[in-house]
Regions:
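Class I S-adenosyl-L-methionine
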Residues: 1-102
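C-terminal target-recognition/interaction regions appended to catalytic cores
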Residues: 61-207
């Protein structure tokens, strides 16, 4: 088989970084996708504008669309919003040293913890651009597990950080939550890919 890849998540209703999906295509379709029958296309049709244009497409989903209305950790009741990585800003250009662009798609949600989780906002000293939030006294901090999960399209009530009964420990810590969220295939994305494959399954493999 020749392998071709096509879909980028930024043109669908998800506020996240680009994903690439690889699909095996028969060798007689050497000029895929130009002459590949549209009915056989394994990918959902784009619905939002980001890397492509179209009057029938909706505006891209931004980080602000997803994170709007969430309380700051100190005001939250949700443990997944209260607890977050306290790794300090390094400013050396390495992973996890930039803040979320609220007017664009979100950065990569990594399956790691200390120092690799991007900042929800940086201080003015570190080049932060969310001036209104800083003026309101909001502090420099990294994304919470809840914010990462919303970017990855998990439901807002899906629990990640959980207490271990009456003890001071956790059944699942924030560090483990970051790893689970970062490793996950975004649920809404997986749903739409699966539904499209369901539609074309009989074309590929017969009834």
């Amino acid at each position: 088989h020749d392998h071709s890849f096509d879909d980028m998540v930024t043109d669908d209703p998800y506020p996240m970084y680009e994903h690439w999906f690889v699909c095996a295509v028969r060798k007689d379709y050497q000029d895929y996708p130009e002459n590949f029958p549209e009915d056989y296309n394994p990918y959902p049709q784009p619905t939002h504008r980001c890397t492509i244009e179209g009057s029938d497409l909706q505006p891209m989903v931004t980080s602000k669309d997803v994170l709007h209305g969430l309380p700051e950790p100190e005001d939250a009741f949700d443990l997944s919003q209260q607890i977050y990585s306290k790794a300090k800003y390094l400013g050396n250009g390495s992973q996890g040293q930039t803040e979320v662009r609220l007017d664009y798609v979100a950065p990569t949600i990594r399956s790691e913890h200390h120092g690799n989780i991007e900042f929800r906002r940086l201080s003015a000293e570190h080049g932060g651009t969310h001036i209104e939030e800083l003026a309101m006294g909001m502090q420099e901090r990294r994304l919470t597990p809840r914010e990462c999960a919303l970017i990855q399209t998990f439901p807002p009530d899906y629990q990640f950080v959980m207490k271990n009964g009456n003890s001071r420990g956790f059944l699942l810590s924030s560090s483990s939550a970051y790893k689970i969220i970062g490793n996950a295939v975004p649920p809404v994305l997986a749903y739409h890919i699966a539904r499209r494959l369901e539609e074309v399954w009989s074309l590929y493999f017969g009834a």
